[in-house]
C-alpha cells in the first residue's frame, strides 16, 4: 500500500510524463481521494524540485523511494552484472526497473516483464523501456501475482527450446 505514489513520481521525474498522467487508483482510491492523492504528490514534487533543481537519479530515488524499492533496484543492477534475468512484475517493480535503467541502461537486457497491470500509467512506463509484457490481463492484485501467472509461460518456452525435436532429429524429410 502506497508504493504506487513513489512509482508515479518516478515515472514523472525519470520518464518525463506529466504527473497527472502518472497518478492512478493504486490500491483502489476513487473520486476525491484520487484528487487528493494527486494534489499531495504534486506538492511533494514541487517541494523536491525547489531543493533539487537538477536532480540525479539517486536524488530522486532517495527522496521518494522506500528501502524496499531501493533494494529492488540494487538487486536488478546486481542481477544484470551477473548476467541473470529478472522477472519484473507490476507497476512498482517496473518503476524500479525504470530507475535502474537510468543508472545502467543495459539492465533492460536482463529484464522479462511479467504483466502490464491495471494501473493506467503502467503501459506508458513499459513503453518508455520498450518492454513487452508476457501478459496483459488488467490485474491489480500485487504480491507478485503477475509473475506467478507469467512464469509457466516462460518455463514452457524454455522447455520447447531445449527439448523439442527439430526436423533432422525426428528424421522428417524436407519436401521443398
Where are these regions (language model features)?
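N-terminal loops that bind phosphate or other acidic moieties
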Residues: 1-176
Amino acid at each position: 500500500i502506497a508504493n504506487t505514489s513513489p512509482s508515479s513520481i518516478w515515472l514523472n521525474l525519470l520518464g518525463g510524463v506529466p504527473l497527472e498522467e502518472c497518478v492512478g487508483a493504486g490500491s483502489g482510491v476513487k473520486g476525491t481521494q484520487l484528487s487528493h492523492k494527486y494534489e499531495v504528490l504534486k506538492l511533494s514534487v514541487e517541494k523536491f524540485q525547489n531543493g533539487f533543481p537538477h536532480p540525479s537519479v539517486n536524488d530522486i530515488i532517495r527522496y521518494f523511494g522506500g528501502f524496499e524499492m531501493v533494494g529492488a533496484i540494487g538487486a536488478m543492477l546486481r542481477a544484470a552484472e551477473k548476467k541473470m534475468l529478472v522477472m519484473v512484475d507490476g507497476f512498482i517493480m517496473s518503476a524500479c526497473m525504470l530507475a535502474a535503467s537510468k543508472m545502467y541502461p543495459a539492465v533492460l537486457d536482463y529484464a522479462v516483464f511479467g504483466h502490464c497491470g491495471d494501473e493506467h500509467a503502467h503501459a506508458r512506463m513499459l513503453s518508455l523501456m520498450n518492454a513487452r509484457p508476457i501478459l496483459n490481463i488488467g490485474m491489480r492484485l500485487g504480491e507478485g501475482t503477475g509473475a506467478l501467472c507469467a512464469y509457466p509461460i516462460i518455463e514452457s518456452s524454455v522447455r520447447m527450446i531445449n527439448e523439442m525435436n527439430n526436423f533432422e532429429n525426428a528424421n522428417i524429410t524436407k519436401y521443398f
